[in-house]
């Protein structure tokens, strides 16, 4: 593993037998930690460029994978477009996985796309968005009327930029793209562990319409397969990732109750319940994010959050299998919690 820019610039003209080079954002995150080993196992033997503000933290999260000769941890800030462009050029990056969030997500993401264009080495992008149809037809039909959460709405804008505002791959600075649209992470439930075990209360207001759930490992697999595809089959497509079945707050509390053998009650998604949720979340994150999350859950209550049968089948094609079971996640999680208590 190397640190910094100890590599010569590589030409963007690659032969078919040249191993690809992928720049992976958020490599220490829920998706990234699962994605890195998948990419290292691919027959194409890609080189992985992992930018980070904290190399020591990232290396500790990667465990033994951080010592692989094809892993290059680069110290720098992905919010700096100059750093990004230099990194893409220096390492001859051929494809990127962009997984970004934050209050400045729009500017950082657009700057990222611009750096890719200027570098002229990147030929494919896998962009992490969110589950849902964010196309023009849906917008004209009124989809945005209930979307008030900034971290969700920004993805509509970014998807529109990709669909209607980037240079074609065949042109200088152009690249193809695949959008991954995950539903609500299984792992979100782990934030409610203390509330579930000590208070018998599932504190996430998922609403009465139902939301799809997704294993971050499935998102990582979809991303790995989309990077490997390099725009041959999945270019210009958005693939939803998650369960076809949706789960209400009551459904979720009932599942946890069944496995734990004790009654778990569900958070309400009416005005009073969402006010209480925001108050709780303000103790965990800043006030901007607390309100933004409340607005997202309000959308879930009004509209639900899921995918069609056709979208689900497209996912199965990309994954090469059905997505993971939410019920099985709960079973495994409770077993682990019980083992932790007994040790």
Describe the residue ranges of each PLM region.
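Oxidoreductase cofactor-interface core, primarily capturing Rossmann-like NAD(P)-dependent enzymes
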Residues: 3-5, 13-47, 51-61, 79-81, ...
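Short beta-strand segments at enzyme active-site cores
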Residues: 126-128
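Residues that mark the N-terminal boundary/hinge immediately upstream of a DNA-recognition element
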Residues: 247-248, 311, 325
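"… SH3/SAM/PH, and C2H2 zinc fingers" -> "… SH3/SAM/PH, FHA domains, and C2H2 zinc fingers"
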Residues: 36-39, 46-55, 82-84, 241, ...
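Terminal hydrophobic/aromatic helix or amphipathic segment near a protein terminus
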Residues: 253-306, 342-343
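Amphipathic terminal alpha-helices
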Residues: 314-343
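NAD(P)H-binding glycine-rich loop region in Rossmannoid oxidoreductase-like domains
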Residues: 50-120, 132-141
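Short, amphipathic alpha-helical "lid/cap" segments that border enzyme active or binding sites
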Residues: 85, 110-113, 216-224, 326-331
